[in-house]
């Protein structure tokens, strides 16, 4: 059975894919994120004892436009992919379906802590102090699982990691841009992702593989450690992506000299612009930091 066939078989057995009356079933508590393709809000789910959930509603026209890029390739939907991701460091997807307006809807675990994006942009050191190594390991393990399942996430960035309360743990979210790691989906031309964290091969419309995620992961970890971008410095906008293969990144130890050098070295190897010089798989990154116990050395 092919990867896509196995995904669809598991999805059918989950009972997902039906109609979801968003306005009747959920009581919105607050809007969490308004993205380029979808809106995400926290709500009480009346069908499940008013438990708090995250609800993602994808804009229909943007969804159709994105999916049209893969016409004829039998691409699994975001819902089909997300339902198959069962890992302690990935936010669980409870159900997927379509709203009464035909919009794709995903109902997922509510993770109560701050987003890594807010922590990094607002330089909230108290959330990360003494916890970076642990959180980075959990992030790496979640990405390793995605890769072992046969996918490329394609949007690894701080916005797509949410901390648990008190930043004791972290979870990966959002499979809206995720694609199978198979030849038809790795051909040049699909330039999607978050520009500040986008690998040169995506920017330049070259062939891709799972190493695009490793680059984005490396940039994300770098920003976690020093609250600066390896190329741009201050995290302001996506234009820095144009420099990802035209100038070298600033060495992490220059900006964070007390960071454990083994962790710093692993992060710098992950974000190398040249694919052949980059960490080849996330398991190698985990191996490189296996003995790192503390964020900083005396």
Regions found by a protein language model. Give the residues of each.
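AlphaC helix of the eukaryotic protein kinase fold
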Residues: 64-84
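Short beta-strand micro-motifs within the conserved protein kinase catalytic domain, predominantly
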Residues: 92-104
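Conserved short submotifs of the Hanks-type protein kinase catalytic core
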Residues: 101-115
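AlphaC helix of the protein kinase catalytic domain
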Residues: 116-127
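Activation segment signature within eukaryotic-like protein kinase domains
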Residues: 135-136
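Protein kinase catalytic-loop region centered on the HRD/HxD motif
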Residues: 141-151
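Conserved activation segment of eukaryotic-like protein kinases, specifically the C-terminal portion
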Residues: 188-201
